[in-house]
C-alpha cells in the first residue's frame, strides 16, 4: 500500500463513517514509517479512535529518539495499535544473523504511554503462521514474554490486552464487558485471579454466547497412584 492508497483509505473512511485497520509497517526496516502518515491523517480528520495500526514491526527497529517523539503523536491522535506477537516473532528478523530482532512493535512503551494497544492473531494454520489456532490466551502468553511485560502489576492487568483494549480498538466498549444490560458473551477460565490465569496457563472451562453455553468442560479428576500423592 503506497502513500496515495493510505490517503484514499482515510478519505473513504471519513466519507462513509467507517473504522480503519491498516497492516502498517510490517517490516524490520526502520525507514518504513507509514504509521507516521496514518497518524498525521487521523489527526487532521479527527478519526484517531476509529483508526488502528496493526503490526507496526518497524517501530521495534527505530531509535528511541524517533519512537518517543511518535508516542506523543500517537497519543494526540488517539490511535489504536494491534500487535500479533506469535506471527511477528516468527516472521520478522528472519534476514538477521545475530543480534536478531524480535520483530515486535513497542508494546510495552505504547502501554506505558497510555496508548491503546492489544494483542491478536491474524493467521490460522496458514503459511504465515502454521501454528495459529485462535487461542488468545496462548497469544497473550507469548506476547508478555516477547514484550517483557511480566512484573506483578503488568501480569495482574495483562488480560486487558486481549479483552477491553481489543473492544476499545473495535469501538464496541459500549456493548462489551460484564455489566447489567450488556450482551452475556464471555469465557470462563479455571483461575482465581488474572495473575493465576496467566501464570498457570488456565484452561477455558466454559464459553457463553448471548447468555447460552456454547460448551462446558467437566472438572478434571485426579487419582493418587502412590502413597506419596495420597
State the predicted function of each range.
Residues 180-230:
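C-terminal cap of metal-dependent C-N hydrolases
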Residues 40-51, 87-91, 101-189:
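His/Asp/Glu-enriched, well-ordered alpha-helical/loop segment
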Residues 1:
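Sequence context surrounding c-type heme c attachment/ligation sites in exported
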Residues 31-33, 93-94, 129-130, 200, ...:
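Short Asp/Glu-rich motifs
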Residues 29, 61, 128, 196, ...:
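Conserved protein kinase catalytic core
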Residues 24-26, 55-57, 83-87, 119-123, ...:
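Active-site proximal loops enriched in glycine and acidic residues that flank catalytic Cys/His/Asp
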Residues 4-52, 56-80, 96-119:
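Histidine/acidic residue-rich metal-binding segments in metalloenzymes
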Amino acid at each position: 500500500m503506497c502513500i496515495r492508497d493510505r490517503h484514499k483509505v482515510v478519505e473513504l473512511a471519513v466519507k462513509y463513517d467507517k473504522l480503519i485497520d491498516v497492516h502498517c509497517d510490517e517490516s524490520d526496516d526502520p525507514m518504513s514509517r507509514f504509521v507516521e502518515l496514518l497518524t498525521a491523517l487521523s489527526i487532521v480528520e479527527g478519526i484517531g479512535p476509529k483508526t488502528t495500526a496493526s503490526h507496526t514491526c518497524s517501530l521495534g527497529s527505530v531509535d528511541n529518539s524517533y519512537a518517543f517523539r511518535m508516542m506523543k503523536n500517537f497519543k494526540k491522535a488517539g490511535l489504536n495499535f494491534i500487535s500479533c506477537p506469535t506471527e511477528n516473532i516468527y516472521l520478522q528478523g528472519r534476514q538477521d544473523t545475530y543480534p536478531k530482532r524480535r520483530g515486535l512493535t513497542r508494546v510495552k512503551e505504547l502501554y506505558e504511554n497510555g496508548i491503546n494497544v492489544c494483542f491478536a492473531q491474524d493467521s490460522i494454520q496458514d503459511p504465515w503462521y502454521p501454528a495459529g489456532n485462535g487461542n488468545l490466551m496462548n497469544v497473550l502468553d507469548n506476547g508478555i514474554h516477547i514484550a517483557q511485560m511480566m512484573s506483578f502489576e503488568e501480569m495482574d492487568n495483562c488480560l486487558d490486552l486481549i479483552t477491553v483494549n481489543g473492544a476499545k480498538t473495535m469501538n464496541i466498549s459500549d456493548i462489551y464487558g460484564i455489566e447489567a444490560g450488556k450482551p452475556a458473551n464471555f469465557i470462563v477460565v479455571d483461575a482465581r485471579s488474572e495473575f493465576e490465569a496467566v501464570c498457570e496457563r488456565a484452561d477455558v472451562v466454559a464459553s457463553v454466547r448471548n447468555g447460552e453455553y456454547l460448551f462446558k468442560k467437566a472438572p478434571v479428576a485426579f487419582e493418587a497412584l502412590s502413597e506419596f500423592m495420597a
